[in-house]
């Protein structure tokens, strides 16, 4: 569709952005915490592929047999809290930055370069989200990889802080950025374009039922999740390794990353991909489904849709 007269751009209040953030927090927090058992298996496969080498189902059985079913909920606390905070920044921030770019570029220019608007908005929102997420993600990975390390979120967080200092929470910040920023760019870019594609067949959004809209959000989210999982898988594996490995004296984070990347190799960096495709595809689909439904429930104004083919 060619760019036509610019539609009226909604003006959001602080309250509106808070509603976007709340919807994102609930969507991300609930979905990530519900996937904790799968994430425990994925992380174990990444960290100890020679031990957990029987695939997803076999590794589930192996963990339950060796440690009990409760081991599959390891890291639930930091996952729920961390990803709720991240979701608030991720979705709320995306709306903030998309509005910022449209206001400053003008609607016509934003329409011509909408892929860049989507990508820039997603990247900036994710950077802020990762600052908040990093300490809790480091704690989660430590609890999953070392089940005897501490008893829950508070114990794990306190022990890391006491024994290794606050800087250790951000030892994985660089790989988190390498993982999450490409992931979030792919997630929102593919979701936006997939939505355009699917709505092109289904018809105008305003003429569809709420059930149809939710189903299209779920389908677009699934498409986005599969793409995002593949793009970010090598950095996800590297992140798991970084949070388990202590740096040698004088070794920089970049040096440790290079060392671990060399050890993993190309195929090793994709360890656990099938499991992660299931997990990320499912949770991304649910996130966008929940986010869309909650925006309606909370009385959020409509998000800005950018027309045109875009670059």
Curated annotation (Swiss-Prot):
InterPro entries: Mit_carrier, Mitochondrial_sb/sol_carrier, Mt_carrier_dom_sf, SLC25A3/Pic2/Mir1-like
Solcar repeat positions: 15-100, 114-197, 212-297
Entry GO MF terms: phosphate transmembrane transporter activity
Keyword Nucleotidyltransferase among UniProt keywords: no
Intracellular or extracellular location(s): Mitochondrion inner membrane
Residue ranges, Mitochondrial matrix side: 41-62, 137-165, 236-253
Modified residues (Phosphoserine): 4, 145
Keyword match Phosphoprotein: yes
Residues modified as N-acetylserine: 2
Pfam families reported in the protein's UniProt record: Mito_carr
Cellular component GO terms, alphabetical: mitochondrial inner membrane; mitochondrial intermembrane space; mitochondrion
Chain ranges passing through the membrane: 20-40, 63-83, 116-136, 166-186, 215-235, 254-274
GO biological process: mitochondrial phosphate ion transmembrane transport; phosphate ion transmembrane transport
Main subcellular location: mitochondrion
Topological region Mitochondrial intermembrane: 1-19, 84-115, 187-214, 275-311
Keyword terms of this UniProt record: Acetylation, Membrane, Mitochondrion, Mitochondrion inner membrane, Phosphoprotein, Repeat, Transmembrane, Transmembrane helix, Transport
Top-rank taxon: Eukaryota
Membrane topology: Multi-pass membrane protein
Function: Transport of phosphate groups from the cytosol to the mitochondrial matrix.
Entry similarity comment: Belongs to the mitochondrial carrier (TC 2.A.29) family.
Protein name: Mitochondrial phosphate carrier protein
Species name: Saccharomyces cerevisiae (strain ATCC 204508 / S288c)
